[in-house]
Amino acid sequence: MHLRHLFSPRLRGSLLLGSLLVASSFSTLAAEDMLRKAVGKGAYEMAWSQQENALWLATSQSRKLDKGGVVYRLDPVTLEITQAIHNDLKPFGATINAATQTLWFGNTINSAVTAIDAKTGDVKGRLVLDARKRTEEVRPLQPRELVADAATNTIYISGVGKESAIWVVDGETIKLKTTIENTGKMSTGLALDSKAQRLYTTNADGEFITIDTASNKILSRKKLLDDGKEHFFINLSLDTAGHRAFITDSKATEVLVVDTRNGNILAKIAAPASLAVLYNPTRNEAYVTHRQAGQVSVIDAKTYNVVKTFDTPTYPNSLALSADGKTLYVSVKQKSTREQEATQPDDVIRIAL
């Protein structure tokens, strides 16, 4: 199913000029540690495609002026916009199925998910995940994180609420296969070990939950810290070979490292309150965004020491990594409130590792 009418045509620039600019500037850019470019308002998550050699950024645009949002396709070297896909629903979360080259975007406000062909920019379909109408008593679950299992063409989406769930979507038919219930309060974090058939989620109850993707049943749930303090384990990223999960906490000044086989804590890494986390197996490093501190930390995953910190004001948000593990991308938000929106677009930063 194609829903092309929901989107405007792609932006087309001069390919020849673009090629010349990339060729002339590549050596200079490659030598720089950091490149920063303004892209669009409401920048959230990113997806990277080795096959398309492109980076996509989900943006929600203005709260007041724009009904929908825009997915930008960026040149991964220059960060120049090469395509703009206008969506009538605002996109927030993002992932890609590398096998099918399908982009998946969570439409948080509308409790939906949209699938887009990475090569053409055409919409392949859309699925409403929670059709309940919002009232004072009813709060539909909102999609947050998305992960794609390329082996089975299955998309897992965390549905966040007072009592969260995980939606399991067939990537071929774009239909709901099943819903994994009872994943706790504000269960945002989501990570997949496809070979082991294990899905992991974390929540504001301080739990680390293990799910069998063969049966879509919860195998175990463990409260990681019993220290009487508030914890919100907001995101996690896996070292599948080492059976480790790196877990961020938006309520505490530390990053946890957990053994995925038993939920035991392997390390507590001192760091500012954190948001996104991404493990890099090529360099055996983990990268963490610290929204309030305006920084990105580089953690040596062997020693568990913070070995480098990048200043990325104002609010570093999400992370993406090139397939070779040599380039890190960071989406950065400007200061904005409901009363006073940001006047400038949000940025994407390219860091040579």
UniProtKB/Swiss-Prot annotation:
SUPFAM superfamilies given in the database record: C-terminal (heme d1) domain of cytochrome cd1-nitrite reductase
Superkingdom: Bacteria
Keywords: Signal
Gene3D superfamilies: YVTN repeat-like/Quinoprotein amine dehydrogenase (2.130.10.10)
Region forming the signal peptide: 1-30
Descriptive protein name: Uncharacterized protein YncE
